[in-house]
Structures are given as C-alpha cells and as structure tokens.
Regions:
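Short active-site-adjacent structural elements
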Residues: 108-109, 138-141
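Pyridoxal 5′-phosphate
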Residues: 131-135
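C-terminal edge-of-domain segments
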Residues: 142-159
C-alpha cells in the first residue's frame, strides 16, 4: 500500500448578507463568508489537501471561480467531486485532521455534525475525520472577525 499526505489551507472574508457554511453545515451567525461558491473554508481546505496528496493541483484549477457552473455551488458537491478525482488515480481517503480558526461563532457544538456530514459525502468513517476549532486570541484578521480560515492535513492510500 502506498500512502501520501496532503495539506490544504483556505480563507474567506466575513461579510453581512451571506450564509455561513462550515464543514458542510449551515451555521447561525450575523455574517457569512464571501466567495464564488458557498465559501466553506473547511471543505475547500480539505479539497486542496486531497488534491495535493494525489498531485492533482488545487481546487482553483479544477473548480475555477471564473466558471459560472460553480457560482454559489454547495461545497459538499466540490468535496464529492474531489474524492472522485483522486479515486480516478487510485487514491482513497485514509484520514483527515483539520483546524478552523474563528473568533465567532463558537464551533465546538457543531463539530460532530460537520464530521458526520463530511463522512457521508466522502463515504468514510466519522472516526477518520478530526476537526478542531481555535481562535487567534483576537490577533490579525481572524481576531478582528474579518474572516475565517481553515487548515487540513489528509492521508491518502493507494493499493
């Protein structure tokens, strides 16, 4: 068995008038993330990590923000397509370790549903997805609540 590791990162600006999607879950908040799609930074970071592990470039290459077909698209669809892309090269998801950086909303109570949602989309076990939430102690753009970022590391396997 061959294993490969990938790393992904994404960040989007918080703005009024948008829904806040994280980990495929709609969260109640006064602001949402600005982006061409639903701007789910966690799913985008995971997509980039998976594509990186398979040496298949990045999310912007496969799902460009210049393409109308991806305007306001549900990022769960992008994640499913990404899993299919890496499967075309013989890779499957081993496990995911991700961190979301946000001052608000508090995310602890939402993490189990994010894990369940992502596991269902990818066809993997919930125990193979670790999601953590942290703040930047009020430092930088995240601390000023101007945006939310996410980091993801994945392990992929190929027989």
């Amino acid at each position: 068995m061959r294993i490969r590791v990938g790393f992904g990162f994404d960040v989007h600006q918080l703005v009024e008038g948008r829904e806040l999607w994280l980990g495929g879950v709609l969260l109640e908040h006064t602001k949402g993330l600005l982006g061409h799609s639903d701007a789910d930074v966690l799913l985008h970071a995971v997509c980039d990590a998976l594509l990186g592990a398979a040496n298949m470039r990045d999310i912007g290459y496969h799902f460009p923000d210049t393409a109308g077909e991806f305007k306001n698209i549900d990022s769960k669809i992008l994640l499913k397509k990404t899993v299919e892309l890496i499967a075309s090269k013989g890779y499957k998801v081993g496990n995911i370790d991700a961190t979301i950086c946000a001052e608000r909303p508090k995310l602890k109570a939402h993490i189990p549903l994010m894990q369940e949602t992502m596991a269902n989309v990818m066809g993997i076990d919930v125990d193979d997805i670790s999601i953590k939430a942290t703040t930047t102690e009020k430092l930088g753009f995240t601390g000023r609540e101007e945006g939310i970022s996410a980091y993801a590391t994945v392990l992929t396997e190929k027989d």
